[in-house]
Amino acid sequence: MITPIHTQHSLILVYINIYSPPILSKLRTGFILWTNTQKTNKKRNMEDQFPKIETSFMHDKLLSSGIYGFLSSSTPPQLLGVPIFLEGMKSPLLPASSTPSYFVSPHDHELTSSIHPSPVASVPWNFLESFPQSQHPDHHPSKPPNLTLFLKEPKLLELSQSESNMSPYHKYIPNSFYQSDQNRNEWVEINKTLTNYPSKGFGNYWLSTTKTQPMKSKTRKVVQTTTPTKLYRGVRQRHWGKWVAEIRLPRNRTRVWLGTFETAEQAAMAYDTAAYILRGEFAHLNFPDLKHQLKSGSLRCMIASLLESKIQQISSSQVSNSPSPPPPKVGTPEQKNHHMKMESGEDVMMKKQKSHKEVMEGDGVQLSRMPSLDMDLIWDALSFPHSS
């Protein structure tokens, strides 16, 4: 009787010689239980891709090798650790010597033994339990979705964790998975070397704020060709680099130019000499420690001559600007006669006023304050005595 057995990856045709109906029924029920357990395990391990590939691959391999070992072994097999097969094979209906090969011919036995040298009978009872089972995480609230414009690159920590989780399964994964794992390890090493260098992704340039840069000024920066020097009293610098010494006179504040010098110290020394000549010991000097040098020397003679010439020039200008006294007046004889007549007329008027005053005083009226002969002014100036 030919019975097809369907699996996930292949179709196996098994020729079974039925010796006893109970054995066949037990075999079918055990296979159905095994397929149901595999379906539930696949649903649970849907999130982990690599363990799913590994278990499906290993179960298919074990299934095929178990069928061939079941057909070729001379001892009662243990297919995938199901105890029903062992109990069925221990049935008293089957003699041990009458079945050297259970379901196949000697030619098929040699073929299967050459393909699979190790029988399934050597597989332990808890073979599947020896594999590390993936722990199902507890149900946690789902994280909010990432709504950025760009995909996130895998972090180095996550890659190392996934590598450590996959390390127990490396011995069960075929060569194709080993090659992909090696490629991934190379990529991790490259990523480790790249993390030492500062890098920016396209998203950083897209979403980062632009930095403000100061505008370039069009005005030229003035380069100081001369070193900053100390400023002295009465000293200033020309725009071509020379130094000038000047002083003001104490009375009229007139500025006196003392000369042009090569250095600021020479100009300050000239100012000190002029200040000492004009003010003496009360002068404010740039170099008070060098006061003894100001009393003698060619510089003192030169500056003294400059000051004297300037003072003489100022005094001469003041004399020329002052007005000359008016000349004495010489009168003619006609002017003298006219002057005598004026004086005689004034004397007559004074005599008349005195006589008129005496007459008024005799009548009891005060006319001492009478300014003129105007009647309005006379009545305003009069003051009558109070009646008793």
Curated annotation (Swiss-Prot):
Any one GO CC term of the record: nucleus
Residue numbers spanned by region Disordered: 314-366
Pfam family, one: AP2
Compartment(s) of residence: Nucleus
Keywords: Activator, DNA-binding, Ethylene signaling pathway, Nucleus, Transcription, Transcription regulation
DNA-binding segment(s): 231-288
SMART domains in the record: AP2
Alphabetized PROSITE patterns for the sequence: AP2_ERF
UniProt keyword Transcription present: yes
Protein's UniProt keywords contain Nucleus: yes
GO molecular function, a single term: transcription cis-regulatory region binding
Function according to Swiss-Prot or TrEMBL: Probably acts as a transcriptional activator. Binds to the GCC-box pathogenesis-related promoter element. May be involved in the regulation of gene expression by stress factors and by components of stress signal transduction pathways.
Protein family per UniProt: Belongs to the AP2/ERF transcription factor family. ERF subfamily.
Protein name in UniProt: Ethylene-responsive transcription factor ERF062
